[in-house]
């Protein structure tokens, strides 16, 4: 499949059946919702820019797995030059949207999970790395947007996941079956989940052997509209102004970001989408590697938004 255009991205999102709730009601048409649409426009920009010849070198690259042309947001970094182009791409997207364009967490999750699954397989003889490579190829071939979910509600932070009064405060495995696992819990502050085709769920802290049944010691991927997933959209400053049809207090009217509490209510994950399952000693390593990549991402996107603010101030 060729790289999607921005309009093709929007049409692909219309085909998803996500369970999204806002103001106590289910959102039936989230793509055209006035509050949610600016967030989708930010992701759309990453597709539009990839179609422009002047930005091709930053926005696209060659897949290390298939040799095909791909969007750089789905790339597995191969060199220092890749990392430099990554951060320049993020600055460009920040300059073009003056907002969060919501694909950085998924990209950073890709690269952290790729190396971690290799090391788990080396120690335990598992097949997580092959599972993950097949998932990445699927994402690249279909030019999909992938969210990364890390933060659990946590509850009492002085206690480990298994010691919480409510077991659902950390996403955890409630059933192991021959064909996969069933998980329950939530991930909080999920930027871009409602604008993504797939999600990679990762650990949120390091842990010990008593926590191996928790999704904090599990990594997996699933469609964002998988059965049992529900999104509760968080509030933004002046968000209801977008419903009034005026320009007062709207801020950045075209682009924006949304966050959601994502509930996993007994969601089934097949074996070929599992990348870590109870190997608790690798939970902290995966978190640490993700954090390193993600700190670099902030050095690009926030600088791009800063460029816009500096320019606006200069014109004021």
What is each model feature region?
Residues 48-146, 198:
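Internal helix-loop-helix
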Residues 186, 190-243:
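A short core secondary-structure module
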């Amino acid at each position: 499949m060729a790289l999607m255009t921005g309009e093709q991205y929007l049409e692909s999102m219309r085909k998803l059946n996500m369970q999204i709730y806002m103001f106590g009601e289910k959102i039936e048409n989230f793509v055209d919702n006035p509050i949610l649409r600016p967030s989708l426009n930010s992701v759309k920009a990453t597709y539009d820019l990839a179609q422009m010849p002047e930005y091709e070198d930053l926005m696209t690259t060659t897949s290390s797995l298939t040799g095909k042309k791909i969007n750089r947001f789905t790339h597995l970094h191969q060199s220092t030059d890749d990392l430099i182009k990554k951060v320049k791409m993020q600055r460009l997207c920040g300059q073009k949207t003056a907002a969060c364009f919501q694909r950085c967490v998924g990209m950073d999750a890709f690269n952290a999970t790729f190396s971690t699954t290799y090391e788990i397989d080396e120690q335990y003889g598992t097949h997580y790395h092959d599972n993950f490579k097949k998932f990445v190829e699927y994402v690249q071939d279909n030019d999909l947007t992938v969210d990364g979910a890390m933060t659990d509600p946590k509850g009492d932070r002085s206690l480990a996941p298994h010691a919480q009064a409510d077991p659902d405060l950390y996403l955890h495995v409630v059933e192991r079956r021959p064909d996969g696992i069933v998980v329950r819990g939530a991930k909080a502050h999920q930027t871009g989940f409602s604008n993504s085709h797939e999600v990679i769920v990762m650990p949120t802290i390091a842990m010990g052997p008593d926590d191996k049944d928790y999704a904090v010691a599990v990594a997996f991927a699933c469609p964002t509209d998988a059965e049992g997933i529900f999104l509760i959209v968080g509030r933004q400053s002046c968000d209801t102004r977008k419903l009034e049809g005026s320009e007062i207090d709207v801020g950045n009217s075209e682009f924006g970001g949304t966050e959601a509490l994502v509930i996993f209510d007994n969601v089934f994950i097949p074996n070929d989408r599992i990348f870590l399952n109870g190997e608790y000693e690798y939970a902290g390593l995966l978190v640490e590697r993700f954090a390193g990549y993600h700190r670099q991402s902030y050095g690009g996107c926030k600088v791009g938004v800063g460029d816009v603010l500096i320019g606006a101030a200069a014109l004021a």
